[in-house]
């Protein structure tokens, strides 16, 4: 979406993507949720001492 609309603000992109996400069924969301879990586990394994500090 950002590539298609390079002048669009990040907040607008986030709102639109959030709206699209809500329209997806659980089955359509599942691959993304599974990939997020896999990446989270990989990150925890590679960086066990990491703590998020904003």
UniProtKB/Swiss-Prot annotation:
Q: Which SMART domains match?
A: HMG
Q: List the SUPFAM superfamilies hit by this protein, alphabetically.
A: HMG-box
Matches recorded under InterPro entries = HMG_box_dom (IPR009071), HMG_box_dom_sf (IPR036910), SRY-related_HMG-box_TF-like (IPR050140)
Alphabetically, the GO molecular function entries are:
DNA binding
User: Where, per UniProt, does this protein localize?
Assistant: Nucleus
Per the record, the major location class is nucleus
Q: Which residues bind DNA?
A: 1-54
Q: Which GO terms describe its cellular component?
A: nucleus
Q: Where are the transmembrane segments?
A: none
Keyword vocabulary terms for this entry: DNA-binding, Nucleus
What would be one Pfam family of this protein?
HMG_box
Q: What is this protein called?
A: SRY-related protein CH32
The root-end lineage is: Eukaryota, Metazoa, Chordata, Craniata, Vertebrata
